[in-house]
From Swiss-Prot:
Subcellular localization, as worded in the UniProt entry: Plastid, Chloroplast thylakoid membrane
The species this protein was found in: Oryza sativa subsp. japonica (Rice)
Topology Lumenal, thylakoid: residue spans: 73-89
GO biological processes: photosynthesis; photosystem II stabilization
Transmembrane segments: 90-110
Function according to Swiss-Prot or TrEMBL: Stabilizes dimeric photosystem II (PSII). In its absence no dimeric PSII accumulates and there is a reduction of monomeric PSII.
SUBUNIT field: Part of the photosystem II complex. PSII is composed of 1 copy each of membrane proteins PsbA, PsbB, PsbC, PsbD, numerous small proteins, at least 3 peripheral proteins of the oxygen-evolving complex and a large number of cofactors. It forms dimeric complexes.
Targeting signal (transit peptide) range: 1-36, 37-72
GO cellular component terms attached to this protein's record: chloroplast thylakoid membrane; photosystem II
Protein name: Photosystem II reaction center W protein, chloroplastic
C-alpha cells in the first residue's frame, strides 16, 4: 500500500504590520521553511491503516450529513427554503384572496360607523 506523508522543517513566523491607506494591520509571513513530501510503496502497518480509515470515515460522516438529508413529498416544504412554505402557487393565491376578502369586509364595516366628538377619530 502506498503512503504519502508531509512534514514542515520549520515554523512560520507571522507579525502584524501597520501599513496601507486604511491603517489596518496586515499579516505577513516569513517563508523560511521547506516542505518535504515522501512517497513509499511499502505496506503501512495494520494499526495505522485502521486509524486512518476511522478518521477518514468520521470526516466523511461529518461533512456529508447535509447531502444525505431526506427531502421528498412526505416532508412537504419543511427545510426546503420555499417562502412561506408554499409548495404550490395556488396556495399563494388563496392566501392573497383571503387577506383581500377580510380587508375589504373590514373597510366596508368601518365606513358605516358614525364618528362622534367623543371618539376623536379613535373608534374601533
Amino acid at each position: 500500500m502506498a503512503t504519502v506523508s508531509a512534514a514542515a522543517a520549520t515554523s512560520v513566523v507571522a507579525r502584524a504590520v501597520l501599513a496601507g491607506p486604511l491603517g489596518l494591520p496586515q499579516m505577513r509571513a516569513r517563508r523560511s521553511e521547506r516542505v518535504r513530501c515522501n512517497y513509499s510503496k511499502e505496506a503501512a502497518t495494520p494499526a495505522a491503516a485502521v486509524k486512518g480509515a476511522g478518521a477518514s470515515l468520521l470526516a466523511m460522516a461529518a461533512t456529508a450529513a447535509p447531502a444525505m438529508a431526506l427531502v421528498d413529498e412526505r416532508m412537504s416544504t419543511e427545510g426546503t427554503g420555499l417562502s412561506l412554505g408554499l409548495s404550490n402557487n395556488l396556495l399563494g393565491w388563496i392566501l392573497l384572496g383571503v387577506f383581500g376578502l377580510i380587508w375589504s369586509l373590514y373597510t366596508i364595516y368601518t365606513s358605516d360607523l358614525e364618528e362622534d366628538e367623543e371618539s376623536g377619530g379613535l373608534s374601533l
